[in-house]
């Protein structure tokens, strides 16, 4: 069980809920980071009294330093300061809750210090899964997923000593706010429409990814990397109720599922307490009052981002970094209301076609592919 944690991305949805869990479990907080929200990070720092607080926006970091001048918390600014938070010696667990590729280098740094990684930054495994998993093996670092789907699979795999026993992993997907719509109808949806997730409360970027089904596509890639399985052993089903969080089908015909209320504090808590379990204040699942559980095939025509992610996973190399970088840039433009909803998959597909894929990539190759994909999107938006 974790005792002291660092949280990368403390002011976002996952970071905020992680601090709730830390308070409930009595965990100490060694470091907190965010991008630019000095006001919220100040409040968190005053409450949890970390040794280190980081804002990657340097102007905001200067503001935070003034705000926390009367405390013992050291304040650093700039992207490189994330690395210092990731290797903070007091922390035994690093929660990577930042959004996007910015989480990759800090995650690798924490792995080299043999920290437990409570992984909520899926882009790290999507873009550089082989490098990350190889590093975790080499340094003996433990990676425990925080995403509800991968936490569910992680739990369903407890006791599985041989990956050859697995027939397939089944990731559940709510379908997002536009489930059942045609491609034409989906294309007319606005920013406000996309940010209305039916079951979960999350940050804006991941909420849009859920609306396009890119989030599920990224989770397919993450599952392949985390559990070292090929694409044909990872499938997706639509499950509107978000009660079955994912399933594992074994070769003997047994199917194990993890169920629970749609509350991110549950997988966060498990990542903190694993291999133990601790009492939770979250609302328990009442099987007698929950709605009927339904399952359906996803519509890859109306939601092409899922297909684009699967194609990138099949190609390998830097294809997934290109996919992810293009998607991050396109979603940012959509949230800024500079492009329409249907432009997201269009721009991702065009960036994939424009940027060459390299196999067996180094970290530098992955970072270069990410930047090239972003530039390709900006050139075509």
Functional labels for PLM-detected ranges:
Residues 1-381:
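Catalytic, metal-anchored helix/loop core of enzyme active sites in primary metabolism
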């Amino acid at each position: 069980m974790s005792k002291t944690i660092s949280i990368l991305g403390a002011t976002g949805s996952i970071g905020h809920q992680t601090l709730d869990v830390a308070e409930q479990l009595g965990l100490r907080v060694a470091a907190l980071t965010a991008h630019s929200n000095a006001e919220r990070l100040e409040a968190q720092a005053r409450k949890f009294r970390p040794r280190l607080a980081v804002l990657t926006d340097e102007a905001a970091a200067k503001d935070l330093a003034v705000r926390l001048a009367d405390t013992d918390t050291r304040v650093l600014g700039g992207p490189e300061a994330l690395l210092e938070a990731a290797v903070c010696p007091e922390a035994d667990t690093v929660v990577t809750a930042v959004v996007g590729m910015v989480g990759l280098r800090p995650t690798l740094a924490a792995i080299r210090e043999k920290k437990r990684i409570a992984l909520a930054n899926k882009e790290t495994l999507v873009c550089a899964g082989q490098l990350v998993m190889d590093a975790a093996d080499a340094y003996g670092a433990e990676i425990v997923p925080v995403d509800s789907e991968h936490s569910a699979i992680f739990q369903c795999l407890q006791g599985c000593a041989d990956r050859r026993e697995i027939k397939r992993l089944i990731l559940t997907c709510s379908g997002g706010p536009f489930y059942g719509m045609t491609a034409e109808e989906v294309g007319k949806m606005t920013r406000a429409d996309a940010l209305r997730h039916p079951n979960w409360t999350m940050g804006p970027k991941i909420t849009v990814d859920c609306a396009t089904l890119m989030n599920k596509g990224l989770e397919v890639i993450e599952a392949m990397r985390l559990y070292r399985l090929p694409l044909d052993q990872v499938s997706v089903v639509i499950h509107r109720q978000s009660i079955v969080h994912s399933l594992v089908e074994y070769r003997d015909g047994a199917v194990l599922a993890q169920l629970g209320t749609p509350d991110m504090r549950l997988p966060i808590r498990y990542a903190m307490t694993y291999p133990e379990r601790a009492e939770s204040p979250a609302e328990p699942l009442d099987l007698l009052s929950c709605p009927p559980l339904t399952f359906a095939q996803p519509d890859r025509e109306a939601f092409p981002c899922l297909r684009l992610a699967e194609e990138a996973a099949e190609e390998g190399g830097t294809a997934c970094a290109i996919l992810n970088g293009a998607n991050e840039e396109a979603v940012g433009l959509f949230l800024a209301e500079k492009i329409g909803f249907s432009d997201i998959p269009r721009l991702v597909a065009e960036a994939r076609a424009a940027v060459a894929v390299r196999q067996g990539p180094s970290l530098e190759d992955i970072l270069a592919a990410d930047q090239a994909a972003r530039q390709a999107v900006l050139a075509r938006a």
